Amino acid sequence: MFGLGHNSKEISMSHIGTKFILAEKFTFDPLSNTLIDKEDSEEIIRLGSNESRILWLLAQRPNEVISRNDLHDFVWREQGFEVDDSSLTQAISTLRKMLKDSTKSPQYVKTVPKRGYQLIARVETVEEEMARESEAAHDISQPESVNEYAESSSVPSSATVVNTPQPANVVTNKSAPNLGNRLLILIAVLLPLAVLLLTNPSQTSFKPLTVVDGVAVNMPNNHPDLSNWLPSIELCVKKYNEKHTGGLKPIEVIATGGQNNQLTLNYIHSPEVSGENITLRIVANPNDAIKVCE
């Protein structure tokens, strides 16, 4: 069974590859369905597809109350499913456990009675965090520059000018502030890069899975093996390409999932037709999925 949804195309695909920083603690990668605790980057928390899509929608609309109906639309109906309300309640409960969040005193997902759910934690993208830290480092270097200018411009006023030879060590003392200022500028440039490398995981990288009709099919590194799904993936991409030829042919397909008999194919097109980007989800075991794609 396929699930196609216009909202998922407009909202989700516009953020392919974007990672979110939650409360300056977790890095959330919706493409690989993972959470990484920034204090312990060795531990990777793998989210279920439902929990990941819930968090994805909440992260794109922080502090906004998302109705239960909107969540049902985004997580299930757009994928071709109709589930009862208990499925959403269970998925929210599981997501809170992954985030180590409390229902009584939530730090991340807050229940708004009779309305829905709200992500109350601070949310930034990795790019926004880098820009903020770079700006902070630049601000730190400014006071030193101002002081140096003040010292160099404060010349004593006197009616009598006396030409007195300056000791050699004056040159050494004058060059010291310049050296210190250069070091501060160098630190300001390198600090954001060092912070990013040490505290944030790298942008999602991919490895090749197969090539179908000249279209590369990739999967995230460290992703569970998708070998059993290869026949289904190849058939689905081939069928998709038959209906999308010429300039509408995708330039890349990213395959994720594979667990719980669910496979997600993200069809990515060229920038000129990026509006065609779409996510297709197959819900079947690898053998039956071939029949679905036909």
Swiss-Prot record:
Residue intervals annotated with topology Periplasmic: 199-294
GO biological process terms, semicolon-separated:
regulation of DNA-templated transcription
DNA-binding region extent: 18-121
Spell out the SMART domains in the cross-references.
Answer: Trans_reg_C
Q: Which Pfam families match?
A: Trans_reg_C (PF00486)
Superkingdom: Bacteria
TM ranges are: 183-198
What are the protein's UniProt keywords?
Answer: Activator, Cell membrane, DNA-binding, Membrane, Transcription, Transcription regulation, Transmembrane, Transmembrane helix, Two-component regulatory system
Keyword Transmembrane helix recorded: yes
Q: Which PROSITE patterns does this one have? A: OMPR_PHOB (PS51755)
Topological domains annotated Cytoplasmic: 1-182
Q: What membrane topology does the UniProt entry give? A: Single-pass membrane protein
Q: Gene3D superfamilies, per this entry?
A: Winged helix-like DNA-binding domain superfamily/Winged helix DNA-binding domain
InterPro entries xref list: OmpR/PhoB-type_DNA-bd (IPR001867), Sig_transdc_resp-reg_C-effctor (IPR016032), WH-like_DNA-bd_sf (IPR036388)
Q: What is one term from the GO cellular component aspect held by the record?
A: plasma membrane
**SUPFAM superfamilies named in the record:** C-terminal effector domain of the bipartite response regulators (SSF46894)
Subcellular localization(s) per the UniProt record: Cell membrane
- What Gene Ontology molecular-function terms does this entry list? DNA binding; phosphorelay response regulator activity
What does the function comment of this entry state?
This transcription activator controls cholera toxin, pilus colonization factor and outer membrane protein expression in V.cholerae. It binds to the 5'-TTTTGAT-3' tandemly repeated DNA sequence in the cholera toxin promoter region. ToxS interacts with the C-terminal periplasmic domain of ToxR, stimulating its activity. It activates transcription at the promoters for tcpI and tcpA and this is presumably via ToxT.
- What is the recorded name of this protein? Cholera toxin transcriptional activator
Task: State the taxonomy lineage.
Answer: Bacteria, Pseudomonadati, Pseudomonadota, Gammaproteobacteria, Vibrionales
